[in-house]
From Swiss-Prot:
Residues 141-152 have a biased composition (Basic residues). It comes from Aspergillus niger (strain ATCC MYA-4892 / CBS 513.88 / FGSC A1513). Residues 1-10 have a biased composition (Basic and acidic residues). This is Mitochondrial division protein 1. The keyword Transferase does not apply. The keyword Coiled coil applies. Involved in mitochondrial fission. Acts as an adapter protein required to form mitochondrial fission complexes. Formation of these complexes is required to promote constriction and fission of the mitochondrial compartment at a late step in mitochondrial division. WD repeats lie at residues 319-360, 361-398, 436-475, 481-538, 541-580, 582-617, 628-657.
Length: 657
């Protein structure tokens, strides 16, 4: 009895069990388990219950509360239930033995493995980095319990206000803040290291991108050469097939009768004789070889400019020796037509930046032009409009000068002489000339089989390109007089200002189906109906001559010498948006994303329609004012983000936009 009584009075409850049927023997008795359970229950109640002094045992309450939350998870409960089915003997046997523990404690890694550890330039250990990250995690957890923390801070504030803080508490708080400052320094250095790594990766990616762009440019050059060779081979095959077909056709039978019989036949039947003589004469005259029209097929579209940054220069070409008056191209890296005051019209291959020929025929400088599907229309100061078909090109090398004045400078002659060996004159491209205006042609536009031309004779003419004749003449002055007489709300009312004498009377035109938009020197934009020949609507807003315009399905954009660009809503006839520059607008064009304009500066003015951002593009960007300045931009053209500009010194450059 004394022996059992001493076991009950043992403070540990299990430490005094020495029977062979104890924990290491056959098992634990129910009495020992009940005693252990009572002690655990009392200990847990003491730890988790409310304490009279909040300064002692607070971390125990927090720890047990966390354990209680973890025990509520279903996975944890299943593990506990499975643990109760295991006997204490199995639990003890599942532990590591003393030998295994000693072996793991004294084991060490060989020097070969330690030598392969990479060197690290960081002065902070992995554990310090973990501590810094752990502090961030604890900070986020504290924010989740913001309400409870705020209440605790209020209680601490009340306590501190009531009782002065002890020096030991202040020292602990100082040490805590110093530790946090040290961890903040570690985290800052870690962030700086990550930023440097990211910068290095970005630089490497930029270098890789440049290498791939160069490779893409080379592939497109090879592709263009292969396409050119393929077109030449196909043309040769077509020529050989035509020659074979001509050789298979039998020659016409020659008459065997004598000349006397022929004379008698002619005298007997005059009509028959005339026909016979006509045939015989024309058979003896060598007829020119007919040129078969060949369409220039584009098998692939260039994509290099799509990967350049906006504002990057693609090519710069010394195109002319005088100011560029008109430029246009069909598609990016395709065919470009340029005209200037040096009385030349040049055809360019934008893929290689080379002049491939000239369009000769005008007696004066070309003021306006357009290219569409190998068809080129040019309007000149000689009051004529000429049509050209580039698919009928037959190139022969010759001098590139069209008309040269005697007072030309020697530098211009040297430039032409240097380009003569590399340029060719396009023959057989001329189709016909449209001659009806009595003054210079200042604007033109064609769509389908309809061409509209505007002239300084103050008229607009509609041409049928199939028949090659004028089908309608629109008198702009008569339309303006009629509008001022009617005085309706949507028509023009005289403002008392006179048109600028230096400006073109018809500054810009564009047609689509039966709709025609025309901008004139009086600042008016008139919308015509070609079916009736009447002005459908007049847009009032500009205070200077209209120099350029373009419209799509919804909006019409106009540029004027009053330094403003206005965007009109075609559905209502009102102004949708407007902005201005420092100098007059000489040229303008837009695509789906941007509006580009030449505004009397050495840069192209770009306006993003999506976000309303204005920026400059061209050779004048970033140029020091004290150094040499690029020439003023006179003409701009934009298609699919591919920008071409023509300058006052005759240089033409291509940019990404």
């Amino acid at each position: 009895m004394d022996k059992h009584r001493r076991r009950d009075e043992s403070p540990s409850g299990l430490s005094d069990i020495v029977e062979p049927d104890g924990l290491l023997g056959t098992g634990i008795t129910s009495r020992h388990i009940e005693a252990f359970g009572r002690k655990v229950t009392s200990t847990a109640g003491h730890l988790m219950g409310p304490a009279p002094d909040s300064s002692t045992g607070g971390h125990y309450h927090t720890a047990m509360a966390d354990i209680q939350r973890e025990l509520r998870h279903p996975n944890t409960q299943r593990k506990v239930f499975s643990l109760t089915q295991t006997t204490p003997t199995d639990l003890v046997r599942s532990k590591l033995s003393t030998t295994e523990i000693q072996s793991r404690a004294i084991s060490s890694l060989p020097d070969e493995l330690l030598a392969n550890i990479p060197d690290d330039s960081s002065s902070y250990s992995l554990f310090q980095g973990f501590q810094a990250s752990q502090d961030d995690i604890e900070y986020r957890r504290a924010h989740r319990r913001r309400s409870s923390k705020s209440k605790k801070l209020l209680k601490d504030g009340e306590t501190r206000g009531a009782l002065p803080s002890a020096p030991s508490d202040l020292k602990k708080e100082r040490d805590l803040l110093s530790r946090r400052m040290e961890l903040m320094g570690v985290r800052k250095n870690m962030c700086s290291s990550e930023i440097h790594d990211i910068d290095n990766k970005i630089a490497n990616l930029h270098n890789m991108r440049k290498i791939v762009l160069d490779r893409l440019a080379g592939l497109e050059m090879e592709e263009a050469d292969l396409e050119h060779e393929l077109n030449e081979i196909e043309n040769k095959l077509e020529d050989i097939q035509e020659e074979q077909q001509e050789a298979e056709v039998p020659p016409p039978a020659t008459p065997k009768s004598s000349e006397a019989n022929d004379d008698s036949i002619v005298s007997e039947d005059p009509a028959m004789g005339a026909s016979f003589m006509s045939e015989s004469i024309y058979q003896k005259i060598p007829s020119p070889k007919s040129v078969k029209q060949r369409s220039i097929r584009k098998r692939s579209m260039p994509v290099l400019h799509e990967h350049f940054a906006p504002g990057s220069e693609i090519k710069e070409m010394p195109a002319h020796s005088d100011m560029v008056t008109a430029i246009d191209f069909d598609y990016p890296f395709g065919t470009m037509i340029s005209a200037a005051l040096d009385d030349t019209v040049r055809v360019w291959d934008l893929n290689v930046g080379r002049c491939v020929g000239f369009l000769e025929g005008h007696n004066a400088s070309v003021r306006c032009l357009q290219i569409e599907d190998n068809i080129v229309a040019t309007g000149s100061m000689d009051a004529s409009v000429k049509l050209w078909d580039l698919s009928r090109a037959r190139t022969t090398t010759r001098d590139n000068r069209v008309t040269r004045r005697e007072d030309d400078e020697e530098s211009a002659q040297a430039d032409d002489a240097s380009m003569a060996s590399h340029s060719t004159t396009l023959e057989d491209c001329y189709v016909y000339s449209l001659d009806a205006h009595v003054d210079e042609v200042t604007a033109l536009h064609f769509k389908g089989d309809t061409l509209i031309s505007g002239s300084a004779d103050k008229t607009l003419r509609q041409w049928d390109l199939v028949k090659g004749r004028c089908v309608q003449t629109l008198d702009v002055l008569w339309a303006a007089a009629q509008a001022s007489t009617l005085g309706s709300e949507t028509t023009w009312r005289p403002s008392g200002r006179l048109p600028d004498a230096s400006a073109d009377f018809v500054g810009a035109v564009q047609c689509f189906d039966a709709a025609l938009a025309c901008g004139t020197a009086d600042g008016m934009v008139r919308l015509w109906d070609l079916r009736s020949g009447q002005v459908h609507r007049s847009l009032v807003g500009h205070t200077g001559p209209i120099t350029c315009l373009q419209f799509d399905d919804v909006h019409l954009v106009t540029g004027s010498q009053d330094r403003s660009i206005r965007i009109w809503d075609l559905r209502t006839g009102s102004i949708f948006d407007a902005y201005a520059y420092d100098k007059p607008i000489t040229s303008m064009m837009f695509d789906t994303k941007r509006i580009v304009a030449a505004a009397g500066e050495n840069v192209v003015k770009v306006y993003d329609k999506a976000d309303g951002h204005h920026w400059d593009c061209g050779a004048g960007v970033g140029v020091d004012d004290s150094g040499p300045q690029p020439a003023t931009v006179e003409r701009v053209r934009l298609k699919d983000g591919f920008l071409v500009e023509g300058r006052k010194d005759g240089i033409v450059a291509a940019w990404t936009c």
